[in-house]
Amino acid sequence: MTDYAKNIQAFYERDDYKALAGQPGATAVEASFKDLTYVPRKTKPLPGMMVGTMLQEFALQPAQPTALYLHIPFCNLRCSYCSFYRNPFEAEQVEEYVQALLAELDFLQQQGVFAKQRPEAVFFGGGTPSVLNPAQISALLNKIHSVAKLADDCEVTFESSIYDLSADKLDACIAGGVNRFSFGVQAFDTHLRRSLGRLNTKEEVTAKLEEVAAKGVKVIIDLIYGLNGQTQAMLLDDIRTALACGVSGMDLYKLQIMHKSPLGQAIAKGNIKYEYNDKMLAEMFVAADALLAEQGAKALSCCHWAMREDERSGYNTLVKSGANIITCGAACGGHMGMYNYMKTMDRSDYVKKATSGQYAVMGMGKHNENYLLLEKLSGQCDSGRFDFALLKQYSDADWESLFKPLLEQWELLDLLYAVDGKYYFTAKGKYYYRQMDRVLLTAAECALYGKPGLMEQAGQKMMGIMKNMK
């Protein structure tokens, strides 16, 4: 039997524990965390050729929470902060890719992937799915309905830019069962939008949001804070503008400066000076969180708010809770049962394999028996609330007691507070939730497996070259 309490002491005895757990910042709104890259332990890497085993085992599994993701890796425009831009829009290449998606959906059905699973969410992401024409949209939606029996209340989300979603595309989406549209607005201010590479004016954006909302479907938008030239007042005005447009939900993300993005490269070369520090960003987020609460929005996670009772952010919730994520397309990863996988990054390679009856996986891993426990723990952190009693079905450990030193420190830092054995994040805690999540998962794995050996530490370092987001 695992001695969790003994094992976790190795984490609390780390020389850098105090820095990892968080210390008071220079002001009340700040906290200081040492950077910690988290890489899951005990995941067994497997070659992509094992994909057949994964599909066979998954086809035999009983019904479980499941989502379906379709990746559309094309964009008409490139945003200045984006490092994921891969394929500019070319009609012939898009059609070729759509045919590959249709073939892949047929293949998954033939393999029995949908035999026992009823997807609770379908998500068209990208890239920009709205580059598809109406016929392509209809073909994909019809194919999904023909190969899979969706849950009765399945959430079907279609990501779109304001620029691309014409009336005929909107109608094709709704006719095919799309009931939720997600727009990467990022900012309403016209000048600020132009600096990001966005063409539409504030007036055009609000008109499109109102047009889609009038169809009776859910409208979700993303906003970014921390953009050069953006003030706190502008961010709060953006939130009020969104609410006036009748949006159903809203995501609020801190700008991530990616090294390979045009913005990241300009900052690295000294051509642009980034204006914000942690104090300013935290103040913006706390003010936004307060306004959303004042307006009656319900926080479903640390970065997503619902304005309608029926908005549940189903796909993201499934992703954060260890559900099966079946993916179609190139350059996307998912989970099936005890396996995770990554699809080929090369679009041409994907098209060739998908149209010849192959599931184009480039690499895989097999989870250990604690995978769901850790996913549920991370999902609770993402939601901004801990209820450790819910973890008992995955582990016999007393996680509240094991995490007590961390929880007490986070209460002192005003990151969370306890009510009847449950813990709720403050606005400050929501701002720092990513750092808290990495610390908590590292501590949990120490409790489960003990202190990592030198070889394991070296492997984690190699796998964690990419810096985690803050």
Locate the predicted segments by residue.
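Charged, E/D/K/R/S-rich low-complexity terminal regions of large eukaryotic assembly subunits
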Residues: 1, 330-470
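Flexible, acidic/Gly-rich N-terminal and inter-domain linker regions that tether
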Residues: 1-66, 115, 451, 459-469
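C-terminal scaffold of the Radical SAM
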Residues: 60, 89-111, 118-397
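Canonical Radical SAM [4Fe-4S] cluster-binding loop centered on the CxxxCxxC motif
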Residues: 62-98
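Short, solvent-exposed beta-strand edge segments and adjacent coil->beta transition regions
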Residues: 65-67, 153-155, 420
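Short beta-strand motif preference
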Residues: 68-70, 183, 425
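Short, flexible helix/strand-to-coil boundary loops that buttress conserved ligand/catalytic motifs
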Residues: 83, 109, 437
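Active-site catalytic pocket residues across diverse enzymes, especially alpha/beta-hydrolases
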Residues: 86, 112, 440
